[in-house]
UniProtKB/Swiss-Prot annotation:
It comes from Bacillus licheniformis (strain ATCC 14580 / DSM 13 / JCM 2505 / CCUG 7422 / NBRC 12200 / NCIMB 9375 / NCTC 10341 / NRRL NRS-1264 / Gibson 46). One of its GO terms (biological process) is translation. Coiled coil: none annotated. The gene is rpmA. Belongs to the bacterial ribosomal protein bL27 family. PROSITE patterns: RIBOSOMAL_L27. One of its GO terms (molecular function) is structural constituent of ribosome. Keywords: Ribonucleoprotein, Ribosomal protein. InterPro entries: Ribosomal_bL27 (IPR001684), Ribosomal_bL27_CS (IPR018261). This is Large ribosomal subunit protein bL27. It comes from the Bacteria. The N-terminus is cleaved by ribosomal processing cysteine protease Prp.
Length: 93
């Protein structure tokens, strides 16, 4: 009786895995309302991390530093100091 001793070798080289190739979802930060735009109370004006823009008149700051309107009115982005910015909402008379 004839026995064949066949050995099969890999046709492709074994490839290791990489730890790269992932990224987090974009957080959609930035201005949500434009200068001069009319907004209602509770509207989100600016989403940010930290205080890139400070709250001005009739604007509140949420727990995640989001700026929102406290009253109905017109949005105004302003500078104060040498290099700081703030956003205010002025009620329409």
């Amino acid at each position: 009786m004839l026995r064949l001793d066949l050995q099969f070798f890999a046709s492709k080289k074994g490839v290791g895995s990489t730890k790269n190739g992932r990224d987090s979802e974009a957080k959609r930060l930035g201005a949500k309302r434009a200068d001069g735009q009319f907004v209602s109370g509770g509207s989100i004006l600016y989403r940010q991390r930290g205080t890139k823009i400070y709250p001005g008149e009739n604007v509140g700051r949420g727990g995640d530093d989001t700026l929102y309107a406290k009253v109905d009115g017109t949005v105004k982005f302003e500078r104060f100091g040498r290099n700081r910015k703030k956003v205010s909402v002025y009620p329409v008379a």
